[in-house]
Amino acid sequence: MASQSQGIQQLLQAEKRAAEKVADARKRKARRLKQAKEEAQMEVEQYRREREHEFQSKQQAAMGSQGNLSAEVEQATRRQVQGMQSSQQRNRERVLAQLLGMVCDVRPQVHPNYRISA
């Protein structure tokens, strides 16, 4: 009877050690999973920062060149407007004289399609 009781005790102790080993293995697995998850999260975060930085640099390059283009277009527009204004000032008197001459110098003529019926 004592041997049976001793055998049962050994079995219980072995079962307890096995349960402890299984619990330890589960804890190690949980720690490894948690560590892997944290590492993956860090990698994702680093990749996201790299892509964001790349996007910002491309956007800055595009907007920078666009800003230069708008400044160039604005400057060219100002030059054209100034050219038109100076041309208007130079030709104003001549155009007015020509226009008044056409309006005031009336030469009556019979229209070519007019038929004299008599």
Curated annotation (Swiss-Prot):
Highest taxon, organism lineage: Eukaryota
Membrane topology qualifier: Peripheral membrane protein
Keyword Membrane in record: yes
Compartments in which it is found: Melanosome; Cytoplasmic vesicle, Clathrin-coated vesicle membrane
Pfam families linked: V-ATPase_G (PF03179)
Cleavable signal peptide: none
Tissues of expression: Brain.
One GO CC term on file: extrinsic component of synaptic vesicle membrane
Gene3D superfamilies assigned: 1.20.5.2950
Main localization category: other
GO molecular function per UniProt: ATP hydrolysis activity; proton-transporting ATPase activity, rotational mechanism
Bias type Polar residues, positions: 57-69, 78-89
Annotated spans, Disordered: 25-90
Example GO BP: synaptic vesicle lumen acidification
NCBIfam families, A to Z: V_ATP_synt_G (TIGR01147)
Quaternary state and interactors: V-ATPase is a heteromultimeric enzyme made up of two complexes: the ATP-hydrolytic V1 complex and the proton translocation V0 complex. The V1 complex consists of three catalytic AB heterodimers that form a heterohexamer, three peripheral stalks each consisting of EG heterodimers, one central rotor including subunits D and F, and the regulatory subunits C and H. The proton translocation complex V0 consists of the proton transport subunit a, a ring of proteolipid subunits c9c'', rotary subunit d, subunits e and f, and the accessory subunits ATP6AP1/Ac45 and ATP6AP2/PRR.
Protein name: V-type proton ATPase subunit G 2
Organism name: Homo sapiens (Human)
Lineage: Eukaryota, Metazoa, Chordata, Craniata, Vertebrata
Gene name of this polypeptide: ATP6V1G2
